[in-house]
């Protein structure tokens, strides 16, 4: 049983999970992952979810059957997804292309779509119902690389949820795969419009390795976090429409309001509120890591159709006390500095660091990672039922927040941010956020120009 909100109770009935295999024979081979793919920080499962309304023109068609068949067709081209990961020497990950298949679950829920989606959306609240964690499937090695659940609602709408082994692809690579499935559901024949490209050697470490950058996101730090910040975590989502973004911008000096991107403004606000909520030692160093793609960078020519990881998490390091007490401009300049570090050369430096340092985990102490998924295309995947009402991240992690696109009941476009914090910290976070998104009276800004200097 699931409850969302507390007054809403619904039941999901699932059939036994099955393995969907490629629709035709595929090569049996070993394929190495890149040195960006197999870093420790990507050895986890990431879920995304899409919701679709009933469509009269597809009456009589079963989304479960349509997607299951199209999935098999797509796996014939993306056959590494049907294999299993193994480790080679020095923990090097590679795919054993066994064609064992991906996990697929058919389900029905006695609820209507509009009961789950309203002025905002909080998929993490009911994700366990719409994406069942099949026992024994959650591992990185020797487990299915994809888990998919298609859930029909009694209104005729339905949900498509998928869990990806992150070492295989980033979200843009996943969208490329989902687009191929969507093409087959809409009757396409032959090869995908964008043929998949493996070529993981493209982001292999150089010989000899060359690390010209300081990678703050991988610095190992002694954990002095208060015990209260290590207790049980709670998940919430927050909607930021034009009104909320305007309110946050009003906390900035005039010259920053029109020149700073929504991502910069929102991320600075969240970082500041989160830092305050965690009640950290003012002298403690904290990091903001902005997940950034290398696709489109002039010094990194990513092959068209490449679906591996092409992302890094460049970070800025500042003092918690300065983030909490300085004007919002201070945190925002830190965000901008982190973003500006991302280049193709920076990504190659990360690959070289992985091999040189034994694939270290990103810093987990005082770090906040944000991943903007508003433009990756999850909200455009059309399986024949039109674009999803929502297509985006399904759950946050303790150190990681995701941004997704969402249109509320008023038709207002905005951003949904998924947050995961200890319960007490979440309450403080909400209080801090109210200060930032409430009415703010404009007045003379007595801020002095702020120069952000990383504190190492």
Curated annotation (Swiss-Prot):
UniProt KW Isomerase keyword: no
Family membership noted in the UniProt record: Belongs to the plant acyltransferase family.
Keywords from the named record: Acyltransferase, Transferase
Catalytic residue list: 166 (proton acceptor), 382 (proton acceptor)
Enzyme class: transferase
Protein name, as recorded: Alcohol acyltransferase 1
Induction: Induced by ethylene in ripe fruits.
Reaction(s) the record says it catalyses: 3-(methylsulfanyl)propanoyl-CoA + butan-1-ol = butyl 3-(methylsulfanyl)propanoate + CoA; ethanol + benzoyl-CoA = ethyl benzoate + CoA; butan-1-ol + benzoyl-CoA = butyl benzoate + CoA; 2-(methylsulfanyl)acetyl-CoA + butan-1-ol = butyl 2-(methylsulfanyl)acetate + CoA
GO biological process: alcohol metabolic process; fruit ripening, climacteric; response to ethylene
Gene3D superfamilies: Chloramphenicol acetyltransferase-like domain
Function: Involved in the biosynthesis of volatile esters which confer kiwifruit flavor. Alcohol acyl transferase that can use a wide range of alcohols as substrate to produce esters. Exhibits benzoyl-CoA:alcohol O-acyltransferase activity.
Organism: Actinidia deliciosa
Tissue: Expressed in fruit.
Enzyme Commission code: 2.3.1.-
GO molecular function, one term: acyltransferase activity
InterPro entries recorded: CAT-like_dom_sf, Plant_acyltransferase
Gene name per UniProt: AT1
